[in-house]
UniProtKB/Swiss-Prot annotation:
Quaternary structure (record): Homodimer.
Binding site for shikimate: S15, K16, S17, T62, N87, D103, Y215
Pathway stated in the Swiss-Prot or TrEMBL entry: Metabolic intermediate biosynthesis; chorismate biosynthesis; chorismate from D-erythrose 4-phosphate and phosphoenolpyruvate: step 4/7
Reactions catalysed according to its record: shikimate + NADP(+) = 3-dehydroshikimate + NADPH + H(+)
Repressor among keywords: no
Stated family: Belongs to the shikimate dehydrogenase family.
Cross-referenced Pfam families: SDH_C, Shikimate_DH, Shikimate_dh_N
Alphabetic keyword roster: Amino-acid biosynthesis, Aromatic amino acid biosynthesis, NADP, Oxidoreductase
Organism: Halorhodospira halophila (strain DSM 244 / SL1) (Ectothiorhodospira halophila (strain DSM 244 / SL1))
GO molecular function, one term: shikimate 3-dehydrogenase (NADP+) activity
CC terms in the record's Gene Ontology section: cytosol
Protein name: Shikimate dehydrogenase (NADP(+))
Residue positions of the active site: K66
Gene Ontology annotations of biological process type: amino acid biosynthetic process; aromatic amino acid family biosynthetic process; chorismate biosynthetic process; shikimate metabolic process
Length: 270
């Protein structure tokens, strides 16, 4: 009998997770079934409980339920605790549920392994201060960047995310003029509406990397902006999606799948 996994969200029909995990399973020879699971916005816990009570082994969690999954989990990884959100739930032998957040490690693996970008000693700018930014900040700080700046339209939110961490400076977009960054990561969802944060034209240092957590068939406005201003490496978030899924797969199965073939297949729409 196949092991049972799912991704839960609302909406959920667009999710690529079933394709990704089905490819991982074929690669490692795992017998599993993975499907999409829709839940009403205020009913995450009952849906998750029913899934696990029915023999489910693990859940991926996407918007808007990462906070609810954090509350649902009985035990948490350090990175989930730092993010205040969970995107991976695992059923434990004693009936409890372990919660992890694989977004940050997924971003790091895409940057480092797939694009050869080392964050150590780099000047890093994080655009946005919402859940996506919080989900990756812990792992980014662990790479010892030289400077970390969080810029957001609402400065209070950036300051709240920075907290008392002396390694981080919080500010609005309007005070970035005259600064240069070697790595700029856009965590806002502006690209989904064909928009981007208001940024000065001279923001990118020579040889800069620009990374948008949004993924699409074409360049997002932020990616197009970065290319036009000389960024050497410009990436969307598809690689991060696959890499965070691989970490979830490892949490469930104890085997780490190859990711490059899956990223390539998704790029060409296979």
């Amino acid at each position: 009998m196949s092991d049972h996994y799912a991704v839960v969200g609302n909406p959920i029909a667009h999710s690529k997770s079933p394709q990704i995990h089905t490819r991982f399973a074929a690669e490692v020879g795992a017998d599993l079934h993975y499907h999409r699971l829709w839940a009403p916005e205020d009913h995450f816990a009952p849906v998750a409980e029913a899934f696990f009570a029915g023999g489910g082994h693990g859940l991926n969690v996407t918007v808007p339920f990462k906070g609810a999954a954090y509350t649902f989990a009985d035990t948490l990884s350090d990175r989930a605790r730092a993010a205040g959100a969970v995107n991976t739930l695992r059923a434990e032998p004693d009936g409890r549920h372990f919660g992890d957040n694989t977004d940050g490690i997924g971003l790091l693996r895409d940057l480092q392994t797939n694009h050869g970008i080392d964050l150590a000693g780099r000047r890093l700018l994080l655009l946005g201060a919402g859940g996506a930014a919080r989900g990756v900040l812990h792992d980014l700080l662990g790479e010892d960047p030289r400077t970390v700046v969080i810029a957001n339209r609402t400065v209070d939110r950036a300051e709240a995310l920075a907290g008392n961490d002396h390694r981080i400076r919080a500010c609005g977009f309007d005070v970035l003029a005259g600064e240069r960054f070697e790595v700029v990561i856009n965590t806002t969802a502006a690209g989904l509406q064909g928009e981007m944060p208001p940024l000065p034209d001279d923001l990118l240092a020579p040889g800069a990397t620009a990374y948008d957590l949004v993924y699409a068939d074409e360049d997002t406005p932020f990616m197009a902006w970065a290319r036009a201003r000389g960024a050497v490496t410009v990436c969307d978030g598809l690689g991060m999606l696959v890499e965070q899924a691989a970490e979830s797969f490892y949490q469930w199965r104890g085997t780490y799948p190859q990711t490059a073939p899956v990223i390539e297949a998704l790029r060409i729409g296979a």
